[in-house]
């Protein structure tokens, strides 16, 4: 670096938090938080961390970039405190909010010096930009988080993370750095929160998927690596994209139950059986005692699996009754079965996200996926109930005998009766209300679910089914070992995540909420006082929920 910039760096570093505070936050990050995304490699970063503190003067841009990364990690970790294990809101007598602000401000100033010294970035620069985006998300500054994530993606392309590096060459990279480049790009491509259609075709990206093990040996090939969950998500995403290549993704055309069924059966018969046993819906838990993060990663993976199944069938909630009545019996039977599968997937999603919620030792309200999936599951179940209780009294089970009620999503009986679905929706609302003390987004979701619950109950009352328990045929028994009329019965349900793209979900979400500050309480676009329920609610997106949560404080509500 030029001598003038070196002087500026030394001046700025005088504002660095005390070593004891930084040590605490770095240690806490690796113990309780890094398992979620695994953007950095703990052994290498900790070795660099020790060496960095031994430097008298920072003269290299690489060392300055590492300082920014260190500060961004500290700021991110501070969002998840206090926790169950650390219940006070200070570190070494200094308030957490003060430490977080200190780290954010100093990192921003040092980042400016990095950009002035060298325009072209590095893997470390992409990493600290990703942590910056995650910090903004924790603060509910979602648009700024998306903008920063876009910048990280652009920076990743500038430094070639989307291209497979040569195995041997003069690039100065070792095998570990090559693998971390793959992992970083994998995380960026799994960043669903953008809710944007990808603008780069797959052929543009030649980088391989990350390895399951950084240093595979005969002894550890059967043990899941900490990054296995991320790799499996990427594999599932590629699988769904392959299925969608023929007829397009859900939402690209009107819902076709035959196409949706073909996708689902290929998913059940080709993808699920190949998943590692520790991540199955009926998992082998032998490794749990050796890998403490594994149970949480498994639930995170299961959340992704159920969401991907919901993604495949969610469009059926947009079918109007006139169109349904025009379908031949065979297709109507498929729609009926798909509605049951959608409800089952929503129930599975709720179970997984609830388990994940209970396993977390930190402040869960800072992890937006916990809030959002409580909300999304409840919306989908609500619409399943409403669609099944149309005003003309058409019953879901009119054509149920066309198919055997078995599914690889679960080997156990899952109650998807209207009464159980309604209880689940109310429980999701209750949990959101509990989380609302620390999250505007959770508060907004709980309030909107309250409106929706009232509408569901009114619909059930009008249809005369509010207190009716479904017959035994409506409480479906699912058995992964049973054959079905449209599957081979050999799937061993396991989970994964959404398409390998920068989007939350397909479908028209732009108008799902109104943004007029005078009608904030009526932000949802459907009329809750009538039987006519427009179709947009089935595509309530993360973007819209975030927009509402950002509107509230700005409107003084």
Curated annotation (Swiss-Prot):
Pfam families in UniProt: Fungal_trans
Segments for region (Disordered): 463-490
GO terms under biological process: DNA-templated transcription
Region (Fungal transcription factor domain) location: 26-186
Entry keyword Transcription regulation: yes
A cellular-component GO term for this protein: nucleus
Localisation: Nucleus
Keywords: Nucleus, Transcription, Transcription regulation
GO molecular function ontology, one term from the record: zinc ion binding
Membrane-spanning intervals of the chain: none
InterPro entries in the record: Sec_Metabolite_Reg, Transcription_factor_dom_fun
Positions with biased composition (Low complexity): 472-485
Function description: Probable transcription factor that regulates the expression of the gene cluster that mediates the biosynthesis of the phytotoxin solanapyrone, a causal agent of early blight disease of potato and tomato.
PANTHER family reported in the protein's UniProt record: COL-21, UNCHARACTERIZED TRANSCRIPTIONAL REGULATORY PROTEIN
Name of protein: Probable transcription factor sol4
Taxon lineage: Eukaryota, Fungi, Dikarya, Ascomycota, Pezizomycotina
Gene: sol4
